[in-house]
């Protein structure tokens, strides 16, 4: 079993790096404001037709464009879901959503979280899934990538005030990166057996003679961007464990690759744009070390089996509860870590049925800020915050002004870094406390004791860190939970983007200082260890008390 797990992890990472390297070169061209080959003429026509100016923006203008687009998308999606019954492509005549569920869902998809307090096949029409959710899957992913584009430019430009043009970046990211790759993935899914139609639900007779209604719909097109954009919201309630979304072992492997593809490519792009590819490799090493350790822990915990069932004499050599037999325990464990290391949230197994330790690792990966590969764009700019913090700590230890890529890190940057890092832990801990203090919060818990608290902590961690997966033993479709999680998702997304853009605006105006004998190398194993230690230290200090009340207490009981 250990050899199979090692081979699975090694194969996954090897294929991932091979695919991400050329994509990273393409992203580097876009960051450097160089059109991809053959696209310049098309861009000129599009910019002219849409009235888009390619004049560069300062950080406030860039941020305003990103926020404006997302707020407009939020309003449109909210009213679309409220009035779903008036819109076309609704063969099942599904009614509009309640105001609190519509708000929660709109915020969820605009913030790239894709938390779902509903069952897709019984709640949303084809039009809502396509024109509403799928569109936001593209736009939220493009927004995250645009923010990291601006931050990378801030490190590589000198004595400037501009960070690029948000509209140009968004168009290029959507047209030349997300749309083509998503199309290829969708076609592959269709070839493998995923659904893509507009037929009404099909009534069939089972082999037992009972009647069953099979849901239909344009699944593959949404499934592709759901994974590529690290969105995660499933067309069906069972998400990627549903055979209509994820029909074969091969599509499952491609789904995992799609989740990590752009976050990995952005690391390569960062090193290329910075003029030192070792910087990108340093980030990949730090992310990969944490990732491999976490996968190993989850696989080990799930292979050990459920100790409560073993104590009763049950034949439970491995923990297969809540897992698809066609995928097995090792693949399910790998997928769980992939989807929570990135801010995806898609699932092929029920995380609520994992062992105490097996479920704690995905929860902790979210709580440290989704920086182990992370979401498209958001993962890298989240990790860059920890890079700045690690550089600052190293500067304190050696008595030098901290600097990174030749840019001095001053008080303003560190205040903004601390603010951005503290946003999500504050939301998680305060949100979980509020839920446990109120009857409306506690009434949603379907399990008592430490596991019930773990369900609450997981839900708030998932929302605040824009992941979207869940311990499913929580009845979250209530006004209290819909509003609480919507607030966590909104602040967790934009409460980090705003200080990140402010950091970019501050750094882009600085000159790069040449490296000296006292400069801390930020590309070697020493800094990789320092960066990993910083991530682990912040995560441990912040969440160990809360984890001790949930999964740790459950494991020890």
Curated annotation (Swiss-Prot):
The keyword Transmembrane helix applies. The keyword Glycosyltransferase does not apply. It holds the Pfam family KdpA. It is found in: Cell inner membrane. It comes from the Bacteria. One of its GO terms (cellular component) is plasma membrane. The chain crosses the membrane at residues 5-25, 63-83, 132-152, 170-190, 253-273, 283-303, 329-349, 356-376, 379-399, 416-436, 484-504, 526-546. Keywords: Cell inner membrane, Cell membrane, Ion transport, Membrane, Potassium, Potassium transport, Transmembrane, Transmembrane helix, Transport. GO terms for molecular function: P-type potassium transmembrane transporter activity; potassium ion binding. Its main location: membrane. It is a multi-pass membrane protein. The system is composed of three essential subunits: KdpA, KdpB and KdpC. PANTHER family: POTASSIUM-TRANSPORTING ATPASE A CHAIN, POTASSIUM-TRANSPORTING ATPASE POTASSIUM-BINDING SUBUNIT. Part of the high-affinity ATP-driven potassium transport (or Kdp) system, which catalyzes the hydrolysis of ATP coupled with the electrogenic transport of potassium into the cytoplasm. This subunit binds the periplasmic potassium ions and delivers the ions to the membrane domain of KdpB through an intramembrane tunnel. Belongs to the KdpA family. This is Potassium-transporting ATPase potassium-binding subunit. The gene is kdpA.
